[in-house]
Amino acid sequence: MNYTTQMDAARKGLVTKEMEAVARKEGMDIEILRERVATGKIAIPANKNHHSLDAEGIGEGLRTKINVNLGISKDCPNIEVELDKVRTALEMKAEAIMDLSSFGKTEEFRKSLIEMSPAMIGTVPIYDAVGFYDKELQDITAQEFIDVVEKHAKEGVDFVTIHAGMNQETAAVFKRNPRLTNIVSRGGSLLYAWMELNKKENPFYQYYDQLLEICEKYDVTISLGDACRPGSIHDATDASQIKELMVLGELTLRAWEKNVQVMIEGPGHMAIDEIAANMVLEKKLCHGAPFYVLGPIVTDIAPGYDHITSAIGGAIAASHGADFLCYVTPAEHLRLPTLEDMKEGIIASKIAAHAGDIAKKVPGARKWDNEMSRARQQLNWEKMFELAIDPEKARRYREESKPEHDDSCTMCGKMCSMRNMNKIMEGKNINILREDD
């Protein structure tokens, strides 16, 4: 039996090789997985032309996944530098990479990325439009925006961020409800500017059905972008954000009618006490579609440390139902991330995702922690390094500060609680001041 997309196959009762791969990785019953793909609760971004893909699932009952943003820009156009980041992201087992390239040899970089990456690849096609057409924003036609999406889809991109919820109604709500930081989504601000300059409807909203035809043809998952995501905790959960979320819910149903998989993008900057409610709102208004959040960043005062503010928010968001975390690096709000910035962002995001999985009782999530605790109890340093989320750093810290005795560290020495409890439980003397027999 033929099928067009993962959702189409699932609705026809078919199990694809991508579904089998996801079920195996997650330890989920294949029929439960297939049913959740059929109803849109799980998305498996898997473009038919991405031949190196090792498919992952995003959504209900699955591990929280993380995405890494990278790409070339006018100020940093070196492709090799970004490809080094790609290789590192893959080594660190990021499940997704988004190419946010906006200038230079974007097509060359994107094709290299798709060819080499087993991780799912996402793009924001509007970023590429200005450079691709070599036109000022207001001179790009609606059809040209759509054509860039098709170009990315043909090349093998697994998911595309489309800010279709910023229509004239959403724009009117934004105008009536002033914000401290206006529109901070790059793609959203570009579309809003295009709409204002041309006095026209958002082309991604007006020609949404055409976009869905493209996504269905190549099995591209549509990641509905949040143009009105809050860029400060002051603007969180305001009228513009919620109005757009309601539109995204309507667009979700239209996509599912065409068997196109959907993810919903979310905040953004948000105080801790608003995060749980926002997860409920998205799942309710967008019919249980997977939720993909940037952070949330829980305070605005920490430039240089936003991988931490983001990890705090990401852990809370994941514990309350977010399915996919976009990493944030220490360079957020300051510069294009370096390779080291990227590593720190990945680690912080992976910690947040795992902490969320423990809280929402994803099967097997606690096993890793229990194994680490057992290794600590046994003072098995090699096992601890092997299990660490960042083995290199854990090993380096111990080697930089060697203890006198191998069964302790330089923090506690022979007063180590693990060491002493092990000895006492075995009926031995702890010998803090004397050498062991």
UniProtKB/Swiss-Prot annotation:
<feature type="binding site">
    <location>
        <position position="265"/>
    </location>
    <ligand>
        <name>substrate</name>
    </ligand>
</feature>
<dbReference type="GO" id="GO:0005829">
    <property type="term" value="C:cytosol"/>
</dbReference>
<feature type="binding site">
    <location>
        <begin position="185"/>
        <end position="187"/>
    </location>
    <ligand>
        <name>substrate</name>
    </ligand>
</feature>
<keyword id="KW-0949">S-adenosyl-L-methionine</keyword>
<feature type="binding site">
    <location>
        <begin position="226"/>
        <end position="229"/>
    </location>
    <ligand>
        <name>substrate</name>
    </ligand>
</feature>
<feature type="binding site">
    <location>
        <position position="333"/>
    </location>
    <ligand>
        <name>Zn(2+)</name>
    </ligand>
</feature>
<feature type="binding site">
    <location>
        <position position="163"/>
    </location>
    <ligand>
        <name>substrate</name>
    </ligand>
</feature>
<comment type="similarity">
    <text>Belongs to the ThiC family.</text>
</comment>
<dbReference type="GO" id="GO:0009228">
    <property type="term" value="P:thiamine biosynthetic process"/>
</dbReference>
<feature type="binding site">
    <location>
        <position position="69"/>
    </location>
    <ligand>
        <name>substrate</name>
    </ligand>
</feature>
<dbReference type="GO" id="GO:0016830">
    <property type="term" value="F:carbon-carbon lyase activity"/>
</dbReference>
<dbReference type="InterPro" id="IPR037509">
    <property type="entry name" value="ThiC"/>
</dbReference>
<protein>
    <recommendedName>
        <fullName>Phosphomethylpyrimidine synthase</fullName>
        <ecNumber>4.1.99.17</ecNumber>
    </recommendedName>
</protein>
<feature type="binding site">
    <location>
        <position position="416"/>
    </location>
    <ligand>
        <name>[4Fe-4S] cluster</name>
    </ligand>
</feature>
<keyword id="KW-0456">Lyase</keyword>
<feature type="binding site">
    <location>
        <position position="409"/>
    </location>
    <ligand>
        <name>[4Fe-4S] cluster</name>
    </ligand>
</feature>
<keyword id="KW-0479">Metal-binding</keyword>
<feature type="binding site">
    <location>
        <position position="292"/>
    </location>
    <ligand>
        <name>substrate</name>
    </ligand>
</feature>
<comment type="pathway">
    <text>Cofactor biosynthesis; thiamine diphosphate biosynthesis.</text>
</comment>
<keyword id="KW-0411">Iron-sulfur</keyword>
<feature type="binding site">
    <location>
        <position position="98"/>
    </location>
    <ligand>
        <name>substrate</name>
    </ligand>
</feature>
<dbReference type="GO" id="GO:0009229">
    <property type="term" value="P:thiamine diphosphate biosynthetic process"/>
</dbReference>
<keyword id="KW-0004">4Fe-4S</keyword>
<dbReference type="InterPro" id="IPR038521">
    <property type="entry name" value="ThiC/Bza_core_dom"/>
</dbReference>
<feature type="binding site">
    <location>
        <position position="412"/>
    </location>
    <ligand>
        <name>[4Fe-4S] cluster</name>
    </ligand>
</feature>
<dbReference type="GO" id="GO:0008270">
    <property type="term" value="F:zinc ion binding"/>
</dbReference>
<feature type="binding site">
    <location>
        <position position="269"/>
    </location>
    <ligand>
        <name>Zn(2+)</name>
    </ligand>
</feature>
<comment type="function">
    <text>Catalyzes the synthesis of the hydroxymethylpyrimidine phosphate (HMP-P) moiety of thiamine from aminoimidazole ribotide (AIR) in a radical S-adenosyl-L-methionine (SAM)-dependent reaction.</text>
</comment>
<feature type="binding site">
    <location>
        <position position="127"/>
    </location>
    <ligand>
        <name>substrate</name>
    </ligand>
</feature>
<dbReference type="Pfam" id="PF01964">
    <property type="entry name" value="ThiC_Rad_SAM"/>
</dbReference>
<dbReference type="InterPro" id="IPR002817">
    <property type="entry name" value="ThiC/BzaA/B"/>
</dbReference>
<keyword id="KW-0784">Thiamine biosynthesis</keyword>
<keyword id="KW-0408">Iron</keyword>
<dbReference type="GO" id="GO:0051539">
    <property type="term" value="F:4 iron, 4 sulfur cluster binding"/>
</dbReference>
<keyword id="KW-0862">Zinc</keyword>
